[in-house]
């Protein structure tokens, strides 16, 4: 047996409570393992530990599995009647049988030895307060990211002197200010609602000298270029009237050059009461020769004008947690995204969650983390992270023509086995953002653009369909993007109306095994009912037998799915009819 391919631990994404009654258990094996059984029971079923008892447990097969590139992910859900569980595994290959315990592998012969210890896996107790709980509304949310300065100018009276004319087309410079503001967002809420959007994610809106606002000057003040507190309150109120949620962007890894505590440090040096609010290794700082790159102090990247905040300092944690609490209590925001979330202290994240969930248990706390983020997703820090690995994997399938539909299956399964199921339900799925090249700019073929969107809309989690160019309102109103808007809106409304598209259960058939560039997967429901997604990424047309109700199609003629064609259909099993 391929022993190196086997792995399990009785915590994190391998063993965790889904709710107060159900425990999910996962184990990875090599492809040589053909069958997995779990032997499980209550730890005290045979008496108190250490009393010479013989504990046997009950054997159950694990039948659900997902294929990874080099391993198989086996999964089962059990209901421990007394909220605790003791277990081990039986692994069967073509010609071998091994038992897998916490301390390793045991042969059948060793199992028969009288008195030999069995160091079983144990989940001690399913404490309700330890169960990761995520906001249920998020999986039903389609987010629209707004970079305020480039979205819509609704109040010219607050335009700064250096504002430039709105540019519907062409490139923009990062430092240019176009005058987009909160009033402009309010004006366009009905447009977003009609599109199918029910969540708005705003990049930072606090006072800052830049247009992007990730170099905050005053965390307690709305940037005057965007409006004021009353305007933002009105935005939240008007959004809520339309059943739309609002999420703010919090920048607590670093601040801007003009943040008052940093200015105090620059003026007073080591005598400043705020000196320990930052990560300074040497004083004075030599800005002329790159103080950050010389290691004199830590910053975001190596930008000297974005000093890194010391979230190890209790005073810093309290200051920013109080700021966030005010956003929730005063503005009634629904979500908070943390910028550069993997660099702030875990203690800050834990304290922030405890405070905000006390105010609003249903608030959505999202971290910007580009890699595997399990250490932040154990139920006591973030609800979710931005699912960059999924978006990049989907785009890679179109970029790398050597990838097959089997590779696609492997990568989707990898993305959805990294975390717990309740986390997967609320991951922030995206194909682009203000930090990346826009998908439409990167994908010259409009058909491929729609194909990638169709795949993403069928994934668990919430979705963001919107680099920093101005919204081309004149072109939109003139109908220049009519087809694109209609197609995206159809996908959004389909996602909203079809529960199976938001579900967790995937199945990857092999109906197109002879054409490796055809993506096919099913989102499973009850009694053979499922939604099937077929995307033809090959260079040839394919035949797709008629079946079920067509929910969405593009470049599909009768039973022929053309190159870059999309077919989404629902098949209802006899038991659901």
Outline where the language-model segments fall:
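Conserved, mostly hydrophobic/aromatic
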Residues: 27, 146, 192, 202, ...
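Active-site-proximal helices and loops of the catalytic beta/alpha 8
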Residues: 236-244, 254, 259-269, 329, ...
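C-terminal beta-strand-rich structural cap/linker in extracellular carbohydrate-active enzymes
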Residues: 29-31, 85, 557-577
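Non-catalytic, glycine-rich low-complexity segments
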Residues: 1-33, 111-129, 134, 510
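Loop/helix patches that line or flank the sugar-binding groove of alpha-linked glycan CAZymes
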Residues: 138, 154-178, 188, 410-413, ...
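Substrate-binding/active-site clefts of carbohydrate-active enzymes
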Residues: 141, 147-198, 205-325, 330, ...
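Hydrophobic faces of well-ordered beta-strands that scaffold small-molecule active sites
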Residues: 142-144, 200-202, 246-248, 336, ...
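Aromatic- and glycine-rich beta-strand/loop motifs that create alpha-glucan
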Residues: 32-81, 92-106
